């Protein structure tokens, strides 16, 4: 009798971690393969390009007409002093925050755009 993939998955799911490690070792020996080598081959494949980006940079592209409001928004978002925030706004395009989550980046972009700035999320 042949087992379906679903039955095999259910059987594996019911095993303990130790039993699964032993199963993997037995399969590696039986088939002459290494699970680590297969994982590296899969990771290097085209799926890598399809992964969703998790860290974003917020770039101030321009201050717009209301520079004072943008400077206040930049100060609030970055914690910079007045002079540093003013210098940052005047040196646009400039990176405001790096490596933040998508939600945080979108919220910051919305806040700065409401103040009149042109903002990019990269």
Curated annotation (Swiss-Prot):
One of its GO terms (molecular function) is structural constituent of ribosome. It comes from the Bacteria. GO terms for biological process: translation. One of its GO terms (cellular component) is cytosolic large ribosomal subunit. The keyword S-adenosyl-L-methionine does not apply. The keyword Ribonucleoprotein applies. Keywords: Ribonucleoprotein, Ribosomal protein. InterPro entries: Ribosomal_bL12, Ribosomal_bL12_C, Ribosomal_bL12_C/ClpS-like, Ribosomal_bL12_oligo, Ribosomal_bL12_oligo_N_sf. Belongs to the bacterial ribosomal protein bL12 family. Homodimer. Part of the ribosomal stalk of the 50S ribosomal subunit. Forms a multimeric L10(L12)X complex, where L10 forms an elongated spine to which 2 to 4 L12 dimers bind in a sequential fashion. Binds GTP-bound translation factors. Forms part of the ribosomal stalk which helps the ribosome interact with GTP-bound translation factors. Is thus essential for accurate translation. This is Large ribosomal subunit protein bL12. The gene is rplL.
